[in-house]
Amino acid sequence: MARQVALDKVRNIGIMAHIDAGKTTTTERILYYTGRLHKMGEVHEGGATMDWMEQEKERGITITSAATTCFWTPKFGNYSGVNHRINIIDTPGHVDFTVEVERSLRVLDGAVALFCAVGGVEPQSETVWRQANKYGVPRIAYVNKMDRTGADFFNAVKAIRERLGANPVPIQIPIGEGEMFAGFVDLIRMKGIIYDKEDGSTYEEVAIPHDLENEARTWRINMLEAVSELDETLLEKYLNGDDITEEEIRSVLRQATLNVSIIPVLCGSSFKNKGVQFMLDAVIDYLASPVDDGVVEGHDPRTEEEIVRQPKDEEPFAALAFKIATDPFVGKLTFFRVYSGVLNAGSYVLNSVTGKKERVGRVLQMHSNKREERDAVYAGDIAAAVGLKEVRTGDTLCDENKPIVLEKMVFPEPVIEIAVEPKTKADNDKLGMSLAKLAEEDPTFRVKTDEETGQTLIAGMGELHLEVLVDRLKREFKVEANVGQPQVAYRETIRGTVEHEGKFVRQSGGKGQFGLVVLRLEPLEEGKGYEFVDEIKGGAIPKEYIPSVNAGIQQAMKDGVVAGFPMQDVKVALIDGKYHEVDSSEMAFKIAGSIGFKGAAKKANPVLLEPIMKVEVITPEEYLGDVMGDLSGRRGHIEGMGERAGAQFVKAKVPLSEMFGYSTTLRSMTQGRANYSMEFETYREVPRNIAETLQEKRVGKDSE
């Protein structure tokens, strides 16, 4: 099957926002208007197409990035009348699922940032915005829920400027707000758009309402000034008072959006069907095609030299696997974005990260959780492959004769863990395999066995994250499990620099064991993890034993010296040592490395670290004092407060250990009228009295 649309007519977009900005409803409307849906699903009825997991339908939130494809022909704009393909990734808004947002942004060419006209910029909007900045993703902003009481378009625009540090430029302004929201003024064409009251999908063009003429003129001048600043020809025309055509405005706006110097802002009410078609026109007009993105960079795994791939079908095949999912019917699905070349179903690809070759059985284009078979996929496409067993998130798939490794994806470490125990013997047999499958799908989910207790521990990004995964165990894998209390993922590090000798000697008849190392330990800056440096001079330890010393140190770091938690941010230099011609072995040096590290760590002022969370609470004013008092009582450090959308917000840094069960406390304290968001910020030293309690607990556990 040949390519359906030219590459410059493809848009790979994400829809990003915080919870309750109307993201899933907006996606539903897009699918309806582009002809992919014949009946619209409502989130609050649990019938939305893109939310296809049971847990999503129940909770009314989006957990996994469902991918879908559709076609749109703009009615207005520089591309009017030309058919385009839009691949959409619907991303979750809950902070526990930030990894889903992160990995979808990595493979997108543009995004629609949704904001609630009442709430404006919520905490999660800031998180997602930072992630989009990190990948340089061009955005348009869509201020949704204009029909809600308290809707304020201009306040939302102001919040985008002030809280996100962006340069929002409205290209529409609303006609009416709240129940009176009837449509908008198109500032480029200077026309009014009024929607049918019953059916929002029909509208008529009218002259700008008399009472809005001055305001529309002011905002058009604002838009013209913003685009003129970025183009000398336009600036000259503007200063001379010459007419500027619609095409000229759109062309400069497009360039400014692509380099993220302007964020065009639109408005609407997806629920009431108002504004979605014009937002789709803006997606085509202002967001990037794979051609605009230009070359993708990587390196040749054989020579390590940098190489590039042009976004063309004629180039060698290169794609990034950005998501692994388990499908009840076809098994493991690997979602990938094609950057160059063509992939035919049934052909072989090289995983250039592992060096393994695998056959792609079938290629599917996903529509939420329904699928369509494709014979081939082309540069710029987003699709799913069946049959790839060894591929992990972030791996590069490419032509085996022209290997390339694309930039990998980096994911945050989990901060919370719980013990899970199978309820029956049958569950026990399935538990390990089921957890392994879930860990394969989600890079921020870890599974390990506690060596002391034999318990299975699962770790993730938050309570909701783990709750959903345990729920999936039950529903998808039919595994019943008992779940323990959430535990904090504490860490240990050192504050001092020391040198220490580690010696392992066994020489009592027969072949002995001998290994002696001298190590220097020093602290690394936060987040650097672990660094090993070989400073051996004059062959004091033969080269072949040095990796064993490193392995022994890393083994010892898993079980810290303060309270047995993993150690981090430590630099270890191997500076001297001794070996024995006959008795030395890899094992002897591994044990010596471990002994040396433990001894050095005890002398290097070791400390316990705990995860600190960035918390934001939004509450009615009458509960503000209670909320702040409660946060302070949780060892929280208040960082700021203010007013937003008629409510008060409080920002604080609070240890994760103090936040368990917070949602229940907050609900009862505010009669359910407050809400909060929380995300991992950093690790910080635990106060001495709490560290001592934790040590006693661990020691008590060990001696039982």
From Swiss-Prot:
Q: Where in the cell is it found?
A: Cytoplasm
An example GO CC term for this entry is: cytoplasm
Q: Give every tr-type G domain span.
A: 8-291
In terms of SMART domains, this protein maps to: EFG_C, EFG_IV
Record PROSITE patterns: G_TR_1, G_TR_2
What keywords are assigned to this protein? Cytoplasm, Elongation factor, GTP-binding, Nucleotide-binding, Protein biosynthesis
Name the protein family: Belongs to the TRAFAC class translation factor GTPase superfamily. Classic translation factor GTPase family. EF-G/EF-2 subfamily.
One GO MF term on file is: translation elongation factor activity
Q: Which Pfam families match?
A: EFG_C, EFG_III, EFG_IV, GTP_EFTU, GTP_EFTU_D2
PANTHER family per record: RIBOSOME-RELEASING FACTOR 2, MITOCHONDRIAL (PTHR43261:SF1), TRANSLATION ELONGATION FACTOR G-RELATED (PTHR43261)
TM annotation in the entry: none
Q: Which GO biological process annotations does it have?
A: ribosome disassembly
Protein name, entry field = Elongation factor G
The gene for this chain is fusA
The record's InterPro entries line, in alphabetical order, gives: EFG_II, EFG_III, EFG_III/V, EFG_IV, EFG_V, EFG_V-like, EFTu-like_2, G_TR_CS
Q: What is its main location?
A: cytoplasm
Q: What does this protein do?
A: Catalyzes the GTP-dependent ribosomal translocation step during translation elongation. During this step, the ribosome changes from the pre-translocational (PRE) to the post-translocational (POST) state as the newly formed A-site-bound peptidyl-tRNA and P-site-bound deacylated tRNA move to the P and E sites, respectively. Catalyzes the coordinated movement of the two tRNA molecules, the mRNA and conformational changes in the ribosome.
Residues that coordinate or bind GTP: 17-24, 90-94, 144-147
